[in-house]
Each structure stands twice: as structure tokens, then as C-alpha cells.
């Protein structure tokens, strides 16, 4: 899943994606600069 913009928000102490990257992993996606569970 590719994010439109980079978001480095952490959820439960774990980043939903790498810093500066636009690709989310681990069942998360970026939406409006926040991590949301897919």
C-alpha cells in the first residue's frame, strides 16, 4: 500500500512504515497523515 504523503506516525510504539518511506506494512495504511488499520 502506497501512501500519497509520507507519515511517520507511530502506533502502539511501532511505526506503521519506515521513516520517510511512503509504503505501509503490517496491516496498516496511511490516511490523512495518520496510520489506520486496514
Curated annotation (Swiss-Prot):
**Top-rank lineage group of the source organism:** Eukaryota
Cellular-component GO terms for this entry: extracellular region
DNA-binding recorded as keyword:
no
Record's keyword annotation contains Disulfide bond:
yes
Disulfide-bonded cysteines: 3-24, 7-30, 16-35
Known PROSITE patterns for this protein? Answer: HWTX_2
Instruction: Just give the chief location class.
Output: secreted
| GO molecular function, a single term | toxin activity
Q: Which GO terms describe its biological process?
A: defense response to fungus; killing of cells of another organism
Tissue distribution of the protein:
Expressed by the venom gland.
Question: Where, per UniProt, does this protein localize?
Answer: Secreted
Q: What is known of its domains?
A: The presence of a 'disulfide through disulfide knot' structurally defines this protein as a knottin.
Q: What does this protein do?
A: Has strong antifungal activity against C.albicans MDM8, C.krusei IOC 4559 (MIC=2.5-5 uM), C.glabrata IOC 45658 (MIC=2.5-5 uM), C.albicans IOC 45588 (MIC=2.5-5 uM), C.parapsilosis IOC 456416 (MIC=2.5-5 uM), C.tropicalis IOC 45608 (MIC=2.5-5 uM), C.guilliermondii IOC 455716 (MIC=2.5-5 uM) and A.niger (MIC=5-10 uM). Lacks antifungal activity against B.bassiana. Has no antibacterial effect against Gram-positive bacteria M.luteus, S.epidermidis, S.aureus or against Gram-negative bacteria E.coli and P.aeruginosa. Has no hemolytic activity against human erythrocytes. Probable ion channel inhibitor.
Similarity comment text for this entry: Belongs to the neurotoxin 12 (Hwtx-2) family. 03 (juruin) subfamily.
The protein, known as = U-theraphotoxin-Aju1a
Name its species. Avicularia juruensis (Yellow-banded pinktoe)
Amino acid at each position: 500500500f502506497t501512501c500519497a504523503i509520507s507519515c511517520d506516525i507511530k502506533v502502539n510504539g511501532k511505526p506503521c512504515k519506515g521513516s520517510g518511506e511512503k509504503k505501509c506494512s503490517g496491516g496498516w495504511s496511511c490516511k490523512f497523515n495518520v496510520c489506520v488499520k486496514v
